Amino acid sequence: MAQINPLPVPLGPWKITVYDQENFQGKRMEFTSSCANIMECGFDNIRSLKVECGGWIGYEHTSFCGQQFVLERGEYPRWDAWSGSNAYHIERLMSFRPICSANHKESKLVIFEKENFIGRQWEMCDDYPSLQAMGWVNNEVGSMKVQCGSWVCYQYPGYRGYQYILESDHHGGEYKHWREWGSHAQTFQIQSIRRIQQ
């Protein structure tokens, strides 16, 4: 049976259908809330999926750990559809949850040059495929405050590399250090950022 985690309850309709084979074949299950361990549902892994409503975060490991993948409305026939722009191809997707605070139209994020919200800062309300091309001098970000909505930050320009999902309703929207970006955070290198679509 699908496990409900202690995260905030979504305020709207969320729906994801997962399959144990590629191209939407084999065993399938629909979810409208979090799943901390797909193996408890009789799957050894998720091989394809369809996001019908809402934004979701998929995780490489159970219990919402490991590499993160943003899953927006659409079809993902194979693992490379959700990790294809990722420089680190990972075929595992073992847990997932809805993104409760995704609000594409009213998103606001402030990035800071150094940890603990120190140094140069820049307020963002739009998508940036290259922070450097838009005027951010560094290829690193020290800390971030999500004032509204949810964002996905990428290690490299063009929305490539590790994905870090930041939400206004987690950590109070405050990410003081790069290690708070996710259990898999390897570096504070961030070179592209975009809003998460609902």
Swiss-Prot record:
SMART domains: XTALbg (SM00247)
Location of region: Connecting peptide: 101-106
Residue span of region N-terminal arm: 1-13
Database matches in InterPro entries: Beta/Gamma-Crystallin (IPR050252), Beta/gamma_crystallin (IPR001064), G_crystallin-like (IPR011024)
Domain of life: Eukaryota
GO molecular function terms listed in the Swiss-Prot or TrEMBL record: structural constituent of eye lens
Keywords: Eye lens protein, Repeat
Entry domain remark: Has a two-domain beta-structure, folded into four very similar Greek key motifs.
UniProt function note: Crystallins are the dominant structural components of the vertebrate eye lens.
Name under which the protein is recorded: Beta-crystallin A1
Source organism of the structure: Rana temporaria (European common frog)
